[in-house]
Amino acid sequence: MLNLISCELSKLKRSKMVLISVAGVLSTPLLMLIEALQTHFDKPEIIFTLSDIYSDSVLYIMLLVNMMIYVAIAAYLYSREYTENTLKTILPIPISRTKLLIGKFCTLLLWIVMLTLVTWAGIFIVCGLYHVVFTLEGYSLLVAISWLPKFLFGGILMFLTTSPFVFIAFKTKGFVAPVIASAVIVMGSVALSNQELGALYPWTATFFLIDGRIESTGYPLALAIGIIILVSAVGFFMTFHHFKKEDLK
């Protein structure tokens, strides 16, 4: 299994997709910097802290920018075997399809964790630049570190909810369909981000869970978590079932 993950990572070293994904998630820190500058000049009486910026960034990470990028890298990671026609050379080697999929899912998780860390560090760095020029209340590494577990947990939740898009990537053998599907899902997430029903929509429920808003919706926490797990499990099952039954021509 470690050899499979190592092989997947070595293939990514030669891919421009890694740099593209890093550049993509860095748009979140830049958006937070722009928002901070706008607040500073338009409403100078408002005092905000580093913790406030991290809190506001959760919306962009869980519902908008990062979620779409994570779906894109998931689609790329799985569809590339079809576009590059490498499955026929991989599967004759004594590697089961199940192990191959598990290796890819582990690689996807590592990639998402890496991008989540880049986002977290990027916010701290751009806030540092703001702090040097304007002074930011509560700017310290300890505050940033206190947000790291929440960011990583959010990354894991987003990894779980990418499984249906992985199935779409396998089913269509392409990159475009899962990305289009993610755009539709993101629009739904944004529409429900201020609605109580968002607790029942798995891609919004992950945001509510990280933001601590599940209880305020009136729905049980266990129900929201159960929906997230159910959608994730269905996505994983359909992916494994389809790939194991697929006839490679």
Swiss-Prot record:
Disulfide bonds: none annotated. Induction: Transcription is activated by the regulatory protein BcrR in the presence of bacitracin. Essential for high-level bacitracin resistance. Part of the ABC transporter complex BcrAB. Probably responsible for the translocation of the substrate across the membrane. Its main location: membrane. Keywords: Antibiotic resistance, Cell membrane, Membrane, Plasmid, Transmembrane, Transmembrane helix, Transport. The lineage of its organism: Bacteria, Bacillati, Bacillota, Bacilli, Lactobacillales. It is found in: Cell membrane. The keyword Cell membrane applies. GO terms for cellular component: plasma membrane. The keyword Transport applies. It comes from the Bacteria. Disruption phenotype: Disruption mutant is sensitive to bacitracin. The complex is probably composed of two ATP-binding proteins (BcrA) and two transmembrane proteins (BcrB). It is a multi-pass membrane protein. This is Bacitracin transport permease protein BcrB. GO terms for biological process: response to antibiotic. The chain crosses the membrane at residues 17-37, 58-78, 108-128, 141-161, 174-194, 220-240. The gene is bcrB.
